[in-house]
Structures are given as structure tokens and as C-alpha cells.
Design a protein with these regions (language model features):
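N-terminal helix-turn-helix DNA-binding core of bacterial DNA-binding proteins
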Residues: 8-54, 81, 89, 112-116
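Hydrophobic residues in alpha-helical membrane-spanning segments
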Residues: 28, 49, 75-79, 94, ...
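Beta-hairpin "wing" of winged helix-turn-helix
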Residues: 63-83
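Generic recognition of well-ordered alpha-helical segments
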Residues: 16, 45, 57, 93-96, ...
């Protein structure tokens, strides 16, 4: 897949980063792929509020930007798996930090914390 054209008029690296990993579901997709390769339906179960269309669009953009790779197996029914590239995996400390920040925010503001949907089998530094 061909890389997307990014319009980085300001030259700001934060702007580029957010244009690549920003989006409603991209950070969650990346976070869940830290654990292991996942099939499309596994991702839809882990991100239940995302429509299949939106999930497909965000997966395509992540693939075009070189953060994930899509493996298609010649089977019936078709089997497709997604996994992080080395470049995508380099986001791990950022994604773990986002999770930790969110957990602190939830705790400080009396919000429920769902370990079930966000655990993804990824150990945080505080859990180790």
C-alpha cells in the first residue's frame, strides 16, 4: 500500500505524529496489536464501539503509514491478520504511557476503570 501524503505545513513533529496515530480508534488498534497479531473480528470485539467501516478505514491508514502489516492467507473463508511493524512497535512506550495517564485520570475523577477492554496482556512498568 502506498504511503499517505501528509500535509505538514508547520513542520512540527507533534503535528506529524498526531496526524499518523491520531484518530478515534488508531491508538486503540495499535495498543491491542502490542500483544499479538489479531484478526479483524478480534479487533472488533476488543473495540466494540467502532463500526466495521471505521475500523477498516483506520486499519488501511495505519497500513499505508507503515505502522501495521496486513497478512492475507489463501483460505476459505479468507483469513486476514494484522500485526505491528517494527516502526509501529516503536510506539509501545507512548501507548503504555497513554494508558497509565488515562488510568490516573479515571482514578482522580472517580471514573470506572475497565481492565477487561484495555488490558490487552501488555504489562505496564507499575505492574511489573
Amino acid at each position: 500500500m502506498r504511503p499517505r501524503r501528509l500535509d505538514n505545513k508547520s513542520g512540527c513533529a507533534v503535528e506529524v505524529t498526531l496526524s499518523i496515530i491520531g484518530g478515534v480508534w488508531k491508538p486503540l488498534i495499535l495498543f491491542h496489536l502490542l500483544e499479538k497479531k489479531l484478526r479483524f473480528m478480534q479487533l472488533t470485539r476488543r473495540i466494540p464501539n467502532a463500526t466495521q467501516r471505521m475500523l477498516t478505514l483506520q486499519l488501511r491508514e495505519l497500513e499505508a503509514d507503515g505502522l501495521i502489516v496486513r497478512h492475507v492467507f489463501p483460505e476459505v473463508p479468507p483469513k486476514v491478520e494484522y500485526e505491528l511493524t517494527d516502526y509501529g512497535r516503536s510506539l509501545e512506550p507512548i501507548l503504555i504511557s497513554l494508558r497509565q495517564w488515562g488510568e490516573g485520570y479515571q482514578r482522580d475523577h472517580g471514573m470506572a476503570v475497565s481492565q477487561r477492554l484495555c488490558a490487552a496482556g501488555v504489562e505496564t512498568a507499575s505492574a511489573a
